[in-house]
Amino acid sequence: MADIKEAAPEMVSAFFGFDKAVFDKNTGTLDLATRELIAVGVAVTTQCPYCIEDHAKRAVKAGATKAAVAEAVMVAAALRAGGGVTHGWKAMKSIADGE
């Protein structure tokens, strides 16, 4: 991260400012644990190992249970699998149209 910060300090600063605002426990409609659970699900979908570990720990620290983290993971997995199925439907449609 130091290399990125050195090469683009303003952008890195803006990114961390944005991240801090999103995960500020004193702002927003969603409580912090819910925001962290959403982050876990997104991290699983984007397959970011650092983000998965960081947000899972932060979710528990914010009050989420291990069961809630597991559920967020499974929701993300279902949506990711659903994307594969819908792409499969497109494949089937593309060959059906040519019949």
Predicted regions and their residues:
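Acidic, glycine/proline-rich low-complexity segments that act as flexible tails and inter-domain linkers
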Residues: 1-36, 87-99
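Iron-sulfur (Fe-S) cluster-binding segments and ferredoxin-like electron-carrier domains
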Residues: 12-14, 53-68, 92-95
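Amphipathic alpha-helical segments within well-ordered protein domains
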Residues: 23, 39, 56-60
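Alpha-helix N-cap/helix-initiation sites
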Residues: 31-32, 49, 66
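Alpha-helical scaffold segments that form or flank carboxylate-/histidine-based iron centers
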Residues: 33-43, 70-78
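Short, thiol/selenol-centered motifs that function as redox-active sites or metal-ligating centers
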Residues: 38, 42-54
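Polybasic, low-complexity binding patches
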Residues: 66-73, 99
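C-terminal structural segments of small proteins and small subunits
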Residues: 70-94
